[in-house]
């Protein structure tokens, strides 16, 4: 019990286990014998397991110069599905810190992973697809990698899997796109105008059996708006029926998702209120905002963004009528004495706006 499993992993690496495993892989990779195939699987699985420890992973990476890292790279273009899988999982594990990710992208790993994905678009090998997408998602986290990966065509490569009916693949696909467009306005606009993608997102927002896919679809819808700030993107999302999902997302139990939804909705209200008006009304946004502002448990940023949104919604006649009918002034004036200064300030501004409008 005194040993953490990370310590054990590091000791196994230092004791030379990796070299033994690589030798087994070398010996069994071209064999069709059942026991060899099973040995290959065990050895490559163990290899991936050792990389789950932070120190053992960093030791084997050796700044990207490590012979082990190089050997694992050579698994990705291999003809063995088992080695392709282990190679992609190993890269996803090496890609757990920014330094490693930046080094790998600068040294051409992205093309190798895209080639691997290309080999599996049609055959539906879910485990390999999932592993390669996991690696790409992790590699896309550092800011400097995003533009490089976008210009290498990663978004297009990932979109080939939009047709997939497998939730694990859908989940990683969504996560990869969301990482790629973070603060990348042009890419967010391009993807946000892609009707096929947006329609698929709206469909997945209803995937009640797969909370992960549902959550990621909502977050990507919101991200497309937040990072593009584009009227065209908003129109595409309105036409595809995405507004109601963003309104529902504002009631999520996760503050980060609530906030992403409110910021996206505020952009919609600022840029395309007339287009979205009907959908916002039908989704009962005004009632939801009233609830968020009245609820003592709402986080300060939720209260702040809800008030910003109310100020924007007043620009629409039907929505303004709803705001007036719901006694917002009372709720907002209470927030003027909120302990959070930003919330209190926004409450004063909102109160003035509401008073003028009434």
Predicted regions span which residues?
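Intrinsically disordered, serine/threonine- and proline-rich low-complexity regions
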Residues: 1-10, 23-24
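Helix-turn-helix repeat elements of alpha-solenoid scaffolds
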Residues: 64-65
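Alpha-helical solenoid repeats of the armadillo/HEAT superfamily
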Residues: 1-3, 14-15, 29-52, 77-96, ...
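Buried hydrophobic core positions in alpha-solenoid tandem helical repeats
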Residues: 20-25, 69-73, 112-117, 157-159, ...
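Recurring C-terminal helix/loop segment of individual leucine-rich repeat
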Residues: 10, 59, 102, 147, ...
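Alpha-helical scaffolds that organize eukaryotic protein assemblies
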Residues: 17, 68-70, 109, 154, ...
